[in-house]
């Protein structure tokens, strides 16, 4: 099954119509050999400095620059985002191919890459 991940539900609906994914499921569309799902823009963000080290919890000139190795991402703490991410995570695990249908440009690419990374995409 091919999985398309769009950046927003309206784009996912348009893609689903084109590829024949006309069956609406919980958090995605399916049909024609495709599953089409969406993010709500940023589902993930970089972890806060304190998530890396207690020494970085409070700002201090002595702790600058803060450059964690490696940078880590986390889900944004919003229930609807967590729910949609769990749907995406399951779809990615079952997919043969994942197609990045995020918005064109650096930000759209980043949104999709972080979601795929957090979901442990192997495609």
Tell me the role of every PLM-derived stretch.
Residues 1-123:
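Intrinsically disordered, low-complexity regulatory segments
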């Amino acid at each position: 099954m091919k999985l398309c991940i769009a950046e927003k539900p309206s784009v996912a609906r348009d893609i689903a119509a084109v590829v024949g994914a006309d069956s609406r499921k919980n958090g995605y569309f399916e049909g024609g050999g495709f599953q089409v799902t969406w993010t709500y823009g940023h589902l993930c963000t970089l972890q806060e400095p304190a998530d890396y080290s207690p020494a970085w919890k409070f700002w201090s000139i002595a702790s600058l620059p803060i450059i964690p190795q490696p940078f880590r991402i986390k889900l944004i703490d919003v229930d609807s985002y967590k729910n949609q991410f769990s749907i995406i995570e399951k779809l990615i695990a079952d997919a043969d191919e994942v197609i990045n249908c995020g918005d064109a440009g650096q930000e759209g690419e980043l949104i999709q890459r972080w979601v795929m990374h957090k979901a442990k995409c192997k495609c």
